[in-house]
Amino acid sequence: KIKKKVFDFKNALSEKKVTNELKKNNIDLICLAGFMKILSKNFIKNFKGKILNIHPSLLPKYKGLNTHEKAIKKKDKYSGCTVHFVNSKLDSGEIINQKKVRISKLDTPDTLAKKILIQEHKLYPAAILKILSL
């Protein structure tokens, strides 16, 4: 059975409470999705090799925000999504898995985002199972 709990992560005090709760429960994996905050180096150090993130580009291309706009502006033929371990550098951790999505000439950032989101919903669970089975 997977135990879950929702945390408010708005400041350093919140981060300390989250860290204590996760350590107390001896967690195996932290999965970020749409988190949109940069974790502190201390938090990452406490859970090294246990934090996953999903990012809407084929890393190492287009780290950070506005990935769909960047891919369309550069006239890329493909974009996609990446599941990776979190380290202290933005969207730079070891890549676990990726899924390509073809960019159509008619795609807008919104339509591309929707296509990639469908693949994210398939890729992330598969990557989580892969990591937990190691």
Model-assigned labels for residue ranges:
Residues 1-134:
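One-carbon transfer enzymes
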